Amino acid sequence: MRFKLNDMEKKWILYDVGNSAFTLLIATIMPIYFNYLADQAGISEVNYLAYWGYATSAATIIVAVLGPVLGAASDTKGRRKKIFLVSLLIGALGCVFLGFTQSWIWFLLLFVIAKSAYSLSLVVYDSMLPDVTTDDRADQVSAQGYAWGYIGSCIPFILSLMLVLFYDKIGLTMKTAMGISFLLVAVWWIVMSLPLLKNLPAEALPVSSFRQQPGCQLPPSERSFFRTEKPTEKVLFFPDCLFLLY
């Protein structure tokens, strides 16, 4: 029997289609452009590869620290839509500015900001799944999100790749082609997010509302909020996990 998505599930999946374009950009075109900027600044290959690794690690640490806190806050304090929207806009605007900066240092800084915001938006996005679908459909909907995300992200990627490869034949410079490519991905990301933003499920009840209901225990997300300090401390200071930063 064919699995049929309902309207809200489709809108949830569309965000995966949008943000996956940014993921593909990070894995393909973005390192090439950073290589170009670093080479223009006279930085050796060894150094610019190291700097790229440091920037990626910095974004990972930021998400590891802020992810649990923002995730709990979005679930228990009625801020889900606000946190999701802010993360989305910071990530998309960072993507736009990445394409037009001519400084490798600013490029790395913007990369850390954009990638962190992108990852934090996913924390809130994933938490929406139980509100978008039922438990027995969650696995299928999540799988559809991954599948359509990869397929849909190919559209802006192919257009961006054509611009980067054949920029000289259409009268553009390398920097202009990159700027248009990054702008294209950011616009795609935002446009694919609009249906979900417009129909975002109702916010979770604030913490005080749970406490005011007789006999109502605090939800798991609130309990996790008060447990984020020690787990985060253990992750950051557990030596065996440091290899993940390389």
Residue ranges of model-derived segments:
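Cytoplasmic membrane-interface "Motif A"-like loop-to-helix N-cap segments
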Residues: S74-L88
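Glycine-rich segments within core transmembrane alpha-helices of 12-TM secondary carriers
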Residues: Q140-V164
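Juxtamembrane intracellular "pre-TM" segments in multi-pass secondary transporters
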Residues: M1-K10, L200-F238
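Helix-loop boundary and gating motifs at the non-cytosolic
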Residues: R2-T60, W104, L108, I113, ...
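Central cavity-lining transmembrane alpha-helices of secondary-active solute carriers
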Residues: L49-A72, C154-F157
